[in-house]
């Protein structure tokens, strides 16, 4: 009997000591059927126009979607708080909006690898006193709410308790920069890349104090359940880094805007208003399959749209053609604006067609312009030199490094065609790219204005507020 009771008690105790397994519901990440990318509008982030979509973040998002083998869905927002909220609620998969790495963002989200670097700078307008430090301001600072600029000012306020600023939720960085130029606000803070891009259209912008240096621009991922997507993003980033994609996009969006000439930019904007209307139709007619604005930008670089222009070397006219070139393409009067534009377009098209097929379509124009400037043979010399230096002869970012070497005996004595002023060719192409970007911006602003004027006024009251002037996307932002 005692043994029987002992066995029962022992069995009960063993049963009580067994581990109880509680079945928990695990989070199963959804398989991506499309890549939903939350973003903000901006020339270096995401823009849409009649020529298609563009932007550093957009181009990378396209490649990432291709890497994942899913369709891309860009979801633009106009408010950072709503953008952050959408990521936390799983309404989007990732934020790609030119955002820098900050302590606050590290706490809230997972951060992707660095895409490029920027400085945070204080921005004011031409004619205002140059501030010596953040306490030496003759007016108010206005910044975007929920931005990294608020974090920077908050840290500065700890050392300078009298520092105050205004925050706005209904403006983006471009609008604040325009308000600086239009004397509507005194100061703002912006990323250096934004200032460099926007001063092509707003030449009165000045950047003063550097408040933060070398900040990494990153993508933001959800704080939880994003291990798989993060692993894929890191693998994709490593692949594109090795392929030179990041360097290519950096050069594409920022390589030509670092140089800035205040007087030249103002003169160009005036010429767009006063001179271009006389010749625009000719550029559009004779551009053919070229973008007429690239042809017009080339002509401005050559002659400032002066049909009687002449250089000491004998080139003349709107497109500054040499006598042999004019004869070759059937131009009899280089001083006739239409003949010169027609001839310049034909010559430029010929340069493009002569280039090797290995040069990507997106970069062929820059190679052709360099050929237009110093000759096709010297560009071929530079390509061969690039190859010998283990650089990519089909990438403009690498050719920019090599072309100036054609002025050094150490290098040009090894080439077939010898010495060439390669650094001038680089400057020439960069200038045309800046003029072209400005023409695109002005053209799009004009189209948007015309569209707003043609739209019936009662539609605005039925459908909500009218779009912000300058918004170029047909997508309705959230």
Curated annotation (Swiss-Prot):
UniProt KW Lyase keyword: yes
Localization in the cell: Cell outer membrane
Membrane topology, from the record: Peripheral membrane protein
Chief site of localization: membrane
Spans annotated as Disordered: 446-478
Cell wall biogenesis/degradation keyword on record: yes
Keywords recorded for this protein, A-Z: Cell outer membrane, Cell wall biogenesis/degradation, Lyase, Membrane, Signal
Region Non-LT domain: start-end pairs: 23-257
GO molecular function: peptidoglycan lytic transglycosylase activity
TM spans (from-to): none
Domain of life where this protein originates: Bacteria
Signal sequence bounds: 1-22
First-level EC class: lyase
PROSITE patterns: PROKAR_LIPOPROTEIN (PS51257)
Active-site residue list: 302
Reactions mediated catalytically: Exolytic cleavage of the (1->4)-beta-glycosidic linkage between N-acetylmuramic acid (MurNAc) and N-acetylglucosamine (GlcNAc) residues in peptidoglycan, from either the reducing or the non-reducing ends of the peptidoglycan chains, with concomitant formation of a 1,6-anhydrobond in the MurNAc residue
Gene3D superfamilies in the cross-refs: 1.10.530.10, Periplasmic binding protein-like II
Family the entry assigns: In the N-terminal section; belongs to the bacterial solute-binding protein 3 family.
UniProt remark on domains: The N-terminal domain does not have lytic activity and probably modulates enzymatic activity. The C-terminal domain is the catalytic active domain.
Protein name: Membrane-bound lytic murein transglycosylase F
Protein species of origin: Shewanella sp. (strain ANA-3)
């Amino acid at each position: 009997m005692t043994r029987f009771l002992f066995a029962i008690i022992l069995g009960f105790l063993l049963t009580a000591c067994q581990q109880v397994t509680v079945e928990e519901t695990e989070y199963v990440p959804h398989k991506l059927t499309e890549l939903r990318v939350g973003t903000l509008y901006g020339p270096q982030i995401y823009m849409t126009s009649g020529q298609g979509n563009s932007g550093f973040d957009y181009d990378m998002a396209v490649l990432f979607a291709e890497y994942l083998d899913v369709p891309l869905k860009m979801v633009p927002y106009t408010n950072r708080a709503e953008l952050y909220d959408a990521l936390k609620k799983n309404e989007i998969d990732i934020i790609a909006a030119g955002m820098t790495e900050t302590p606050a963002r590290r706490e809230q989200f997972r951060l992707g690898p660095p895409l490029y670097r920027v400085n945070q700078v204080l921005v004011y307008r031409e004619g205002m006193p140059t501030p010596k430090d953040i306490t030496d301001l003759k007016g108010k600072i206005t910044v975007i709410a929920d931005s990294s600029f608020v974090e920077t000012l908050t840290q500065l306020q700890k050392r300078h308790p009298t520092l105050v600023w205004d925050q706005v939720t209904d403006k983006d960085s471009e609008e604040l920069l325009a308000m600086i130029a239009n004397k509507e606000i005194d100061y703002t803070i912006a990323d250096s890349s934004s200032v460099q891009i926007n001063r092509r259209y707003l030449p009165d912008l000045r950047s003063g104090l550097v408040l933060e240096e070398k900040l990494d621009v990153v993508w933001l991922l959800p704080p939880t359940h994003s291990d798989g997507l993060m692993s894929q993003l890191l693998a994709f980033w490593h692949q594109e880094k090795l392929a030179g994609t990041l360097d290519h996009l950096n050069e594409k969006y920022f390589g030509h805007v670092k140089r800035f000439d205040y007087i030249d930019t103002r003169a160009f904007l005036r010429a767009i208003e006063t001179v271009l209307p006389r010749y625009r139709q000719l550029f559009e007619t004779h551009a053919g399959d070229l973008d007429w604005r690239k042809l017009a930008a080339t002509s401005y670089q050559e002659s400032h749209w002066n049909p009687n222009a002449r250089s000491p070397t004998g080139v003349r006219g709107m497109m500054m053609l040499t006598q042999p070139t004019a004869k070759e393409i059937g131009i009899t009067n280089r001083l006739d604006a239409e003949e010169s534009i027609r001839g310049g377009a034909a010559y430029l098209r010929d340069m493009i067609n002569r280039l090797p097929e290995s040069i990507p379509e997106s970069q062929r124009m820059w190679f052709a312009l360099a050929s237009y400037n110093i000759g096709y043979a010297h560009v071929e010399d530079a390509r061969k030199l690039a190859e010998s230096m283990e650089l990519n002869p089909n990438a403009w970012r690498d050719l920019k490094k090599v072309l100036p070497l054609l002025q050094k005996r150490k290098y040009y004595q090894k080439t077939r065609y010898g010495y060439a002023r390669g650094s001038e060719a680089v400057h020439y192409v960069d200038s045309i790219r800046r003029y072209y970007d400005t023409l695109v911006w002005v053209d799009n602003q004009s189209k948007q204005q015309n569209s707003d004027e043609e739209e019936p006024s009662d539609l605005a009251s039925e459908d909500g507020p009218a779009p912000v002037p300058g918004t170029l996307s047909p997508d309705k932002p959230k």
